[in-house]
């Protein structure tokens, strides 16, 4: 029985091969009974192949492609969208180039700005470029879950805030983070740490300029961002100007984690590819997880040995908070590792890249830079440095950051999608079936000329009320500009991120004038990884305008 199954399943090529020999069909006149049996099964293989091809083609003809076959019947009107390629759908559009721009073009082509269907292999997906539909997708309880990526499942054990399914455990994590890490009083309590990080960054920038005549800005921003989150989460900071072995290993782990979480993995959408691991996602995650576990576990154990640190005061870090939890709130070690490591991934990438985009625009627009510096001189002067309390008095600085967020949203597709938990009627007769991956093209919304005047121009004044602009809340209340998402799954660290970026931009502009470098012109080309970053890192010349060494921050 076993041998017969083997010859029947793979013996078709034995029948076909003789047709191409000099004996041709005469081969079968002298063939064994097993070969003749294989030949008789050949029509069955042809029939099955024809049926499979027809099934693929029929499903492919559905709007949105293969994964949408039969799903449009749940609504009165089919959701328009591209067919893509048979079997793989629109996977190429998502994995090559800039998917937010490609999807925006496809939505225009299919008249599907409100809602567009498309297939990612076996995954049915929808995307919107409309603020009102975006509000429904982001705030409806029917879209409160996230599709789980293989890399997130392995690196974060599916237990971190970003990917935990909607329910009691997720609500517990959200409550803990909101109360003990991202609450306004906690953000204010850690101002001294943020000031120390930015002063160290300014010093390193000045040293690099004096030694090389040009500064590669991103690495300084990433080092400061890593120290900022390490200080508030783990209670540790590093000297980024002199990388020891521990700092080097930490940077390597963070960089590898960024790459893995940001990689578009075909195996997430074509399950039969998972055992093959064509992009080596599984293998790389398997190598990284033990290193991450060891690193975080050592810090947790160190905190356990220093019990006197765990006090109720504002200066305790997030590890102290997690260790102090009791009863039903207490997390096991694996959950703690997932939550703490997620803070590193989510807390460093966006802050550094948004600051880099902001500074790049200011180098390209010296008139905006001078205007921001004039505001700083009027409010802060030259006799002290910028503090958190100054930021509300610096509306133009805040407008500059908002405009950078509008032009270069760190997550142009809001980083991680949503997953519908049941059929949802979206209006106009369209229905999003349960189990559909739902996305918002925030880049398309922030570059829509029907929403924003001259959307491709850098104009911070559009957000300055006393200059005829409009006050726009970027924290998720106004879906015309919601770079941190909205609803239950809004980024919990949005307030900390904005406070950090506003302070950094203000201090960078206060202490230096930023000029372009002749050999490294500013290039705003994009590359989408975990976040959308500058394809060519920013290089520029910082000229001291207010010496920072004399200030004690």
Curated annotation (Swiss-Prot):
<dbReference type="GO" id="GO:0020037">
    <property type="term" value="F:heme binding"/>
</dbReference>
<dbReference type="GO" id="GO:0005506">
    <property type="term" value="F:iron ion binding"/>
</dbReference>
<keyword id="KW-0479">Metal-binding</keyword>
<keyword id="KW-0349">Heme</keyword>
<dbReference type="InterPro" id="IPR017972">
    <property type="entry name" value="Cyt_P450_CS"/>
</dbReference>
<keyword id="KW-0503">Monooxygenase</keyword>
<feature type="binding site" description="axial binding residue">
    <location>
        <position position="491"/>
    </location>
    <ligand>
        <name>heme</name>
    </ligand>
</feature>
<dbReference type="InterPro" id="IPR001128">
    <property type="entry name" value="Cyt_P450"/>
</dbReference>
<dbReference type="InterPro" id="IPR036396">
    <property type="entry name" value="Cyt_P450_sf"/>
</dbReference>
<dbReference type="GO" id="GO:0016705">
    <property type="term" value="F:oxidoreductase activity, acting on paired donors, with incorporation or reduction of molecular oxygen"/>
</dbReference>
<dbReference type="InterPro" id="IPR051996">
    <property type="entry name" value="Cytochrome_P450_78A"/>
</dbReference>
<keyword id="KW-0408">Iron</keyword>
<comment type="similarity">
    <text>Belongs to the cytochrome P450 family.</text>
</comment>
<dbReference type="InterPro" id="IPR002401">
    <property type="entry name" value="Cyt_P450_E_grp-I"/>
</dbReference>
<dbReference type="GO" id="GO:0004497">
    <property type="term" value="F:monooxygenase activity"/>
</dbReference>
<dbReference type="Pfam" id="PF00067">
    <property type="entry name" value="p450"/>
</dbReference>
<protein>
    <recommendedName>
        <fullName>Cytochrome P450 78A4</fullName>
        <ecNumber>1.14.-.-</ecNumber>
    </recommendedName>
</protein>
<keyword id="KW-0560">Oxidoreductase</keyword>
């Amino acid at each position: 029985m076993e041998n017969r199954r083997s010859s029947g399943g793979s013996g078709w090529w034995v029948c076909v091969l003789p047709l191409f020999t000099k004996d041709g069909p005469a081969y079968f006149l002298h063939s064994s009974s097993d070969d003749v049996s294989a030949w008789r099964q050949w029509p069955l293989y042809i029939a099955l192949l024809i049926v499979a091809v027809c099934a693929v083609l029929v499903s492919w003809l559905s709007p949105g492609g293969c994964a949408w076959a039969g799903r449009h019947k749940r609504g009165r009107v089919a959701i328009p969208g591209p067919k893509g390629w048979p079997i793989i759908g629109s996977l190429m559009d998502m994995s090559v180039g800039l998917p937010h721009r490609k999807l925006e073009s496809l939505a225009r082509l299919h008249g599907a700005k409100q809602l567009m269907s498309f297939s990612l292999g076996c995954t049915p997906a929808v995307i919107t470029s409309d603020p009102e539909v975006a509000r429904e997708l982001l705030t409806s309880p029917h879209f409160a879950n996230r599709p789980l990526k293989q890399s997130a499942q392995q690196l974060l054990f599916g237990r971190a805030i970003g990917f935990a399914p909607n329910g009691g455990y997720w609500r517990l994590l959200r409550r803990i983070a909101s109360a003990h890490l991202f609450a306004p009083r906690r953000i204010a309590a850690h101002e001294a740490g943020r000031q120390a990080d930015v002063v160290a960054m300014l010093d390193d920038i000045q040293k690099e300029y004096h030694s090389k005549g040009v500064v590669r800005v991103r690495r300084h921003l990433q080092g400061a961002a890593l120290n900022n989150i390490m200080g508030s989460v783990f209670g540790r900071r590093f000297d980024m100007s002199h990388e020891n072995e521990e700092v080097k290993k930490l940077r390597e782990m963070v960089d590898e984690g960024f790459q893995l979480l940001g990689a578009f993995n075909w195996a997430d959408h074509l399950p039969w590819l998972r055992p093959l691991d064509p992009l080596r996602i599984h293998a790389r995650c398997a190598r990284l997880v033990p290193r991450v576990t060891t690193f975080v576990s050592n810090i947790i154990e160190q905190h356990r040995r220093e019990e006197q640190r765990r006090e109720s005061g504002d200066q305790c870090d997030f590890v102290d908070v997690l260790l102090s939890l009791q009863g039903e709130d207490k997390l096991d070690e694996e959950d703690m590792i997932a939550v703490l490591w997620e803070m590193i991934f989510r807390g460093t990438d966006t802050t550094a890249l948004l600051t880099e985009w902001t500074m790049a625009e200011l180098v390209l627009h010296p008139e905006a830079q001078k205007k921001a510096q004039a505001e700083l001189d009027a409010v802060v002067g030259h006799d002290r440095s910028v503090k958190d309390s100054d930021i509300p008095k610096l509306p133009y600085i805040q407008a500059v950051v908002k405009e950078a967020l509008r032009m270069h949203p760190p997550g142009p597709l809001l980083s991680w999608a949503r997953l519908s938990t049941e059929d949802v009627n979206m209006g106009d007769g369209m229905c999003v079936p349960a189990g559909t991956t739902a996305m918002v093209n925030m880049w398309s919304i922030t570059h829509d000329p029907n929403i924003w005047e001259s959307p491709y121009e850098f104009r911070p004044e559009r957000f300055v009320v006393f200059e005829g602009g409009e006050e726009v809340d970027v924290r998720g209340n106004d879906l015309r500009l919601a770079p941190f998402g909205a609803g239950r799954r809004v980024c919990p660290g949005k307030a900390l991120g904005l406070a950090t970026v506003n302070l950094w931009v203000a201090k960078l502009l206060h202490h230096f004038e930023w000029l372009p470098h002749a050999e490294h012109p500013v290039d705003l080309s994009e590359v989408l990884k975990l976040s959308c970053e500058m394809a060519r890192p920013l290089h520029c010349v910082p000229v001291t305008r207010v010496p920072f060494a004399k200030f004690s921050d």
